[in-house]
Design a protein with these regions (language model features):
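Membrane-interface starts of transmembrane alpha-helices
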Residues: 78, 82, 103-104, 136, ...
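A feature for the membrane-embedded catalytic helix bundles of lipid/isoprenoid biosynthetic enzymes
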Residues: 4-5, 9-13, 17-66, 142-293
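Glycine-rich adenosyl-nucleotide cofactor-binding module
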Residues: 48-88, 103
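Short amphipathic alpha-helical coupling elements at transmembrane boundaries
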Residues: 66-74, 123, 127, 137, ...
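Alpha-helical transmembrane segments of multipass membrane proteins
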Residues: 71, 91-95, 235-239
Length: 293
């Protein structure tokens, strides 16, 4: 009997001996027959875009970035284009910070928050268009680092111009040192802990840190790691800028930047498997494969 509807086809396929059917989990597919089914499928995709490692501020950003991404996928826009555009918004934010003054700093903080929201759109567009790639992940990382460098330089210049004292230039040097050291340490950590899956670094790090609750260094890092996330930082800057407390935010940034890289270096050495163990594992795998031949 010839199937005339999708429902009949779905029912008759398992009865055909020439076709193998596999059960697919409900959350991985959606049959769309009506406009209501389409809305249900879109909501399922929205939930799929939320990462397990997303914190409160990241989920708040998703409420804005996901609708934006849904509009972007209607056009020939690639995830890498979104990453570069987001960096441009970040550079504009840094320029307003560098100009100094209350309103300019407040506008810079607002643009910083906009860049943070758009920072989620490149990954969302990549997933919705099935265009995820290692290059895209690394480009996003480079754009994130460049954004931070521009932002920190802008904050340093702005505080120096506003205060008229060279002390902030010294603080700015310490801030840039901490930021660069943190970028290098995190890059090394990403290579050691998440080689081949760089987007999983945070999840891997959290899993390792939570498995050692008695380690005070890791406990401290795990409880405060949300502070250095890009999603939290812009909200904090906006609050400090709103109350004209950017000098406090600047000093806290100097301290935070010089706490990240020691924790990253320590955890990358503590969590990474010894090289000798990797060699032994590869040798055992070769011996096992040779025994099968």
């Amino acid at each position: 009997m010839q199937a005339e509807t999708l429902e009949e086809l779905h029912t008759s396929l398992p009865e055909m001996h020439s076709v193998t059917s596999l059960a697919v989990p409900e959350e991985q597919w959606q049959r769309v027959n009506t406009p209501e089914d389409r809305l249900s499928a879109e909501r399922k995709l929205d939930r799929w875009l939320v990462k397990p490692t997303d914190g409160i501020y990241a989920r708040l950003n998703r409420r804005i970035s996901i609708p934006i991404s849904r509009q972007l996928i209607k056009f020939p826009i690639t995830p890498n284009m979104v990453s570069i555009f987001t960096l441009g918004v970040g550079v504009a934010s840094a320029a307003f910070f560098a100009y100094g003054g209350y309103w300019s700093t407040l506008l810079g903080a607002f643009l910083c928050l906009c860049a943070s929201i758009l920072d989620g759109s490149d990954g969302e567009v990549a997933r919705l268009k099935l265009q995820e790639s290692d290059f895209g992940c690394w480009l996003e990382t480079i754009c994130d680092y460049a954004f931070y460098l521009f932002l920190l330089v802008g904050m340093t210049i702005g505080q120096w111009r506003t205060s008229g004292t060279s002390t902030y230039l010294v603080y700015g040097g310490l801030l840039l040192f901490g930021a660069l050291a943190s970028f290098l340490a995190l890059g090394w950590e990403r290579r050691r802990l998440a080689s081949g899956r760089p987007e999983q670094l945070l999840k891997i790090w959290q899993t390792h840190a939570e498995s050692r609750p008695s380690n005070p260094f890791l406990y401290f890092g795990r409880r405060l790691e949300f502070i250095v996330r890009r999603c939290f930082f812009p909200y904090a800057l906006l609050v400090f800028a709103l109350f004209n407390l950017m000098n406090v935010a600047f000093v806290l940034s100097v301290i935070g930047a010089n706490l990240v890289w020691p924790i990253a270096l320590y955890s990358s050495r503590a969590f990474a498997r010894p090289r000798s163990q990797d060699v032994e594992n590869r040798a055992a795998a070769r011996e096992y494969a040779a025994g099968l031949l």
